[in-house]
Amino acid sequence: MIYVDADACPVKPEVLKVAERHGVEVTLVANSGLRPSRDPMVHNVIVSGAFDAADDWIAERAGPGDIVITADVPLAGRCVRAGALVTGPTGRVFDEANIGMATA
């Protein structure tokens, strides 16, 4: 599964193309409206407007074998600790070796 912190993610279209090419499900998580997809492999989740609601939703589900795309460094840290592969929208990879420095 690919989880996308979708509220301010500039690469949603690219993520969807790559996921479709590889047959991987995508869940877009946001506090506000998302454009519906006809693709059964794409899931939209609208969370409450509460602070960090989208981050909490993703962090509670992401784990080994999942990919998380986010520019939110604290969320990246939570997901790395849960065993997910995490990258920012620019392609920056967050991992155990660099997440401590990124959150500092």
Cite the ranges covered by each PLM segment:
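Nuclease catalytic cores that cleave nucleic-acid phosphodiester bonds
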Residues: 1-104
